[in-house]
């Protein structure tokens, strides 16, 4: 009787594994409608495009949450969205209007510079191709392994030409998306390994800071 909303929080930056169960948003919506209460879904990372086409596991998108009937959806402006740090809330007008009337709204709202930056990022999403090209986190996710390997080899050549007394080579590695997103994902990648000879790591770091 006292329940005012059903909240589903997506585990965007962690995973619970083993004998676990979770309720899908599509299962919650009919229950909420039956009791005339809203469904709120916190997606965390705020994905707007399907990442599966870039070799990652499926991450729920904002569009999917809305299509499944969520009344309010919350997600981050940074992380996988690729914009400034901010919290974004979208949903049905009557619930958004209620939030606007809350006394905390003025204290929690973003400044004009953040709003302007967020607007520019969201405009990139008018075309998925443009978003993948211009938003750094998406561009890095979509970069083919061959291109990463090419850049790593180029970096190895540059470092070797500096005369640095070290063993420098390209190695295979696994990368994570980071930023509190897709915690179990491992992407095949390439790294440059540097093993200094006759100098400490600190000395090598200082030398590299002055490379041109």
Model regions and ranges:
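Helix N-terminus capping/helix-initiation residues
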Residues: 24, 61, 144, 178-180, ...
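Structural motif of enzymes handling amino- and sulfur-group chemistry
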Residues: 94, 110-159, 173, 183
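Conserved C-terminal alpha-helix-loop-beta "cap" of PLP-dependent enzymes
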Residues: 149-212
């Amino acid at each position: 009787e006292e329940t005012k909303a059903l909240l589903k929080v997506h585990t965007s930056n962690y995973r619970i594994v083993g004998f676990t169960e979770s309720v899908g948003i599509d299962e919650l919506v009919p229950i909420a409608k039956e009791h005339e209460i809203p469904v709120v879904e916190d997606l965390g990372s705020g994905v707007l495009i399907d990442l599966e086409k870039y070799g990652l596991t499926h991450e729920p998108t904002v569009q999917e949450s809305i299509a499944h009937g969520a009344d309010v959806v919350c997600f981050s402006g940074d992380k996988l969205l690729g914009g400034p740090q901010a919290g974004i809330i979208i949903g049905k007008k009557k619930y958004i209007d209620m939030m606007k009337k809350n006394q905390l709204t003025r204290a929690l709202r973003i400044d004009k510079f953040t709003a302007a930056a967020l607007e520019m990022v969201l405009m990139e999403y008018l075309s998925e191709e443009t978003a993948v090209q211009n938003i750094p986190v998406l561009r890095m996710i979509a970069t083919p392994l061959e291109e990463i390997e090419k850049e790593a080899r180029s970096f190895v050549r540059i470092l070797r030409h500096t005369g640095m007394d070290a063993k420098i080579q390209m190695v295979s590695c696994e990368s994570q998306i980071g930023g509190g997103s897709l915690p179990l994902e491992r992407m095949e990648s390439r790294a440059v390994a540097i093993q200094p000879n006759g100098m400490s790591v600190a000395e090598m770091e200082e030398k590299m800071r002055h490379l041109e």
